[in-house]
Amino acid sequence: MTDAALTTLRNHLLQALENHPGSETRRLFHGRGRCWPGLEQITVDWLSGIVLVMLFREPEAEHLAALYELLDELTRSPQWQHSGARGLLLQHRHREGSESEWLAGEPQTQWQITEHGLHYLLDLGSKQNSGLFLDMRLGRQWVREEVRGKRVLNLFAYTCGFSVAAIAGGAERVVNLDMARAALSRGRDNHRLNEHDLSRVEFLGHELFKSWGKVRKSGPYDLVIIDPPTFQKGSFALTQDYRKILRRLPELLTERGTVLACVNSPDIGPSFLIDSMAEEAPQLHFERRLDNPPEFADIDPNSDLKALVFRL
């Protein structure tokens, strides 16, 4: 982080607030895409009126002080007033517990956001991840447009963002599986926020590799979504375990089933999914890679989110 980089950040954020997304949710600045030299450690999100600034590496003391000054100036700017922003939260992702501090506005522990007209509840200031990964915005929209009348399996469901999009898109039924039951509980809350019929949604709080019987029982599925963490201690190691899922897909899918397979590790490119699918489930053919939101531009397109569509 340099003085020149901070000036770039200031100008970018003032412009972003001038053209704020209103009640919607968007990333305002994506330094981690490495398109902004000196700002690789910072991102800024607009969460339906809350500005979330995330630091992924500790800057030098003088630059950290300058960043605080910049953010204070931002909250007193005409652009801030114009945007109607309600608060600013700085999260130190590099520190133990992802320590957070409110620099403006009334502290909020929970906050409702909107994405493509759908509502989600976030945790602010208490957890490393707030509850919705914004880079998957277009993936959720694709699911919403794909699933009318279909049965969906959502693996590694987290807070059920895909499920909310699927039910909004007219899916017949969605089965969500995640070993984190608290995340699934939040998923229920997200469906309720959108006044969805919960009789069409199933929540399985189980470890996937011990639960194939339960997963098969609720199938077959027209769409299987696989969006695992890069590493989940004690339960999932991406490169070793992803293949185990892929080889099971043919027994889970309907005759013309579709798979949305995702990976979000900078060290793993799309060829990993394409080659692994060809080896483990050759019946499934690669169709396309979904676009990522333009605000998540990355200097290396193989480093950012990969969301690939396969069909029988």
Predicted features along the sequence, with ranges:
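Non-catalytic accessory regions of SAM-dependent methyltransferases
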Residues: 1-48
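Non-catalytic substrate-recognition/targeting regions of SAM-dependent transferases
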Residues: 37-38, 43-45, 66-133, 141
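Conserved class I S-adenosyl-L-methionine
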Residues: 149-158
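Conserved SAM-binding loop of SAM-dependent methyltransferases across substrates and taxa
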Residues: 159-171
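Conserved SAM-binding motif I beta-strand of class I
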Residues: 173-178
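S-adenosyl-L-methionine
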Residues: 179-225
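S-adenosylmethionine
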Residues: 208-282
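C-terminal catalytic and target-recognition region of SAM-dependent MTase-like enzymes
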Residues: 258-312
